[in-house]
Amino acid sequence: MATDMHKLLGTSEEDDDEEMDMDVKEEDDGDRRNRDKHAASGSSSNDEFMFQQSMQDQVGTPGGGGSRRSRPLEEKERTKLRERHRRAITARILGGLRRHGNYNLRVRADINDVIAALAREAGWVVLPDGTTFPSKSQGTKPTGGSSAVAAGSSASHIASQQTSPPALRVVSSGLRSPVELSSCRMKGVFTPAPSPYDMLPIQSPELVGSVNKAEGLVGCSVDVINSKQILEIPPNLTEQDFSGTPYVPVYVMLPLGVINMKCELADRDGLLKHLRILKSIHVDGVKVDCWWGIVEGHSPQEYNWTGYRQLFQMVRDLNLKIQVLMSFHECGGNVGDDVCIPLPHWVAEIGRTNPDIYFTDREGRRNPECLSWGIDKERILRGRTALEVYFDYMRSFRIELAEFLEDGVISMVEIGLGPCGELRYPSCPIKHGWRYPGVGEFQCYDKYLSKSLRKAAESRGHLFWARGPDNTGSYNSQPQGTGFFCDGGDYDGLYGRFFLKWYSQVLIDHADQILCLAKLVFDSSCIAAKLPDVHWWYRTASHAAELTAGFYNPSNRDGYSAIASTLKKHGATLSFVSGEVQVLNRPDDFSGALGEPEAVAWQVLNAAWDSGTPVARENSLACHDRVGYNKMLESVKFRNDPDRKHLSSFAYSRLVPALMEGHNIVEFERFVKKLHGEAVMNHHHHHHQQV
């Protein structure tokens, strides 16, 4: 089944020091052989790497006339870099198989497993010792060492596929701090999956000498040799043609503060101007948050929709569509938040006397970003349960703005299910000190969720399980530094499986109950739920960051199918927040965090498609350049899909003044046309690099 592939993880970063020590001598001899080979023939990726190492020996040896052999510690570090580079290639191969195939591979598959799986898929027989021969339908078993030759040639063929095209190598200085040094070194080891768009022409020589600017170079491998940067600039590649692909409607997310705290349009004239520009480039519509803290901000069941009515009328007059988000969370404190919109004032008053209405971590820190799911059925909000509060809010929207629903101006209603409107626990709060790529913490220590856990433990007959795990580290821990998330840790023991099943089921039950109410309210209108892209630590066994966020998705279990089935049950669309573009826009070390945004995305999308759930997407970080847009297109347009699967819509984040600038709006218009499946003329720009 396709879901088997969801568990295909890349190999973990297991730096076995003893093994590497044994390899140092052999690989040093290999350096010399490869230097000779590089001088003779030149251009394989392995030769380039060895050539770089020879340069490092020359530059790094004081006096210049000494031995080229580096100190043992440096050789060991070089060996580690080679190993990480090899594992990154393996992870990309696994990612491709996960995306396009259905192969029965073990969790920690290596390249031999990949070759064997491909051979078996092609009808060959592969024995446990690696002996490979055709099946009876293909021919007779070869004799002697021919199978080894076949296996070797297969490996050689796959390795040849990894060989990169010739690239310009530029050496310059300019590192200014150890942090920058580390950042560039890691970029030389791990790069995102190669694509026709993993490149960025260098427009000025200053880029070569500036690490801050070089961090934005896409697809350019940045290696470091004793305070020297080596930039490998891939050759120019033709952009993909998306003409004739299925039409994907494009929505632009409006500014978070488009409606002020008085429920009025903050800048009517400026907004109208921008909406007209969006209409002129054939954007389908806009997406807007309907903030609980604004509409029901002062008193229970007193709703003010005035500003939203004005906004919807303006959008309708321009013949645009609207996607609305029922935002039952606060705004402010998260990445990209530029305004502060708290929960309703009367809710905050209840929280001051009963802070257990908020999610709580093991240290007792409360998070007022949204209400705990433990009070969904607790009648503590001025005589109402949380579910009743959400239902009344949605019903008020349905009554007051019915005309926009009935005439189709509102094309989708997304139901906020947690922090940032996403279905997840607030496991990574910046306000409590979390920083990427920490594993986060479980958020189940308010008295209402604690009561639910106790009840679940009693029903299992193990009352001593009525507690959260005590060996999960802290917000910024890494999996291997904890007893719970490490390989073979407690997460996979009897108690761990019980706790994680309960923790994730609370999330699913919350979604199930609210979506049931939403379907009652909005009836025939399209509803949706948003899922985040929790990609860090995906290539470890435990998937720690996903576990704390409420997705029970370790390497031996599929945590997204049950969620997709719940959405399917209520006819809801799965709106997925895409994280792939972060590889381009952020200097985060994806290799060190063992993150794989594309793999997470494909697992979630396949879970949705397998259940028959429609999929919409939105980007998580702003992007105004062609390289970023092309990367997004790769993740939202499925050109080679035999079933012609496509998104129900794409929401672009977000409408800001920079988007409206001349060159940026031209690039965005190209992006919109490609999402619509229209032909786009390629205008080639010539860039000159001075070395």
Swiss-Prot record:
Gene (UniProt): BAM7
Region of interest (Disordered), ranges: 1-83, 130-167
Active site (catalytic residues): 422 (proton donor), 618 (proton acceptor)
GO cellular component assignments: cytoplasm; nucleus
Sequence similarity: Belongs to the glycosyl hydrolase 14 family.
Example GO biological process: regulation of shoot system development
Compositionally biased region (Acidic residues): 12-29
Keywords attached to this entry: Carbohydrate metabolism, Cytoplasm, Glycosidase, Hydrolase, Phosphoprotein, Polysaccharide degradation
InterPro entries: BES1_N, Glyco_hydro_14, Glyco_hydro_14_CS, Glycoside_hydrolase_SF
SUPFAM superfamilies listed in its UniProt record: (Trans)glycosidases
Subcellular location: Cytoplasm
Domain of life: Eukaryota
Annotated GO MF terms: DNA-binding transcription factor activity; hydrolase activity, acting on glycosyl bonds
Polar residues biased stretches: 41-59, 132-143
Catalysed reactions listed for this entry: Hydrolysis of (1->4)-alpha-D-glucosidic linkages in polysaccharides so as to remove successive maltose units from the non-reducing ends of the chains
Keyword Phosphoprotein found: yes
PROSITE patterns: BETA_AMYLASE_1
Transmembrane residue ranges: none
Location of Phosphoserine modifications: 195
Lineage: Eukaryota, Viridiplantae, Streptophyta, Embryophyta, Tracheophyta
Chain intervals with Low complexity compositional bias: 144-160
First-listed, main subcellular location of the protein, grouped into a coarse class: cytoplasm
Organism from which the protein derives: Arabidopsis thaliana
Residues at which substrate binds: 289, 329, 337, 530, 535, 619-620, 654
EC number(s) reported in the record: 3.2.1.2
Composition bias type Basic and acidic residues, residue spans: 30-39, 71-80
The protein's name in its UniProt record: Beta-amylase 7
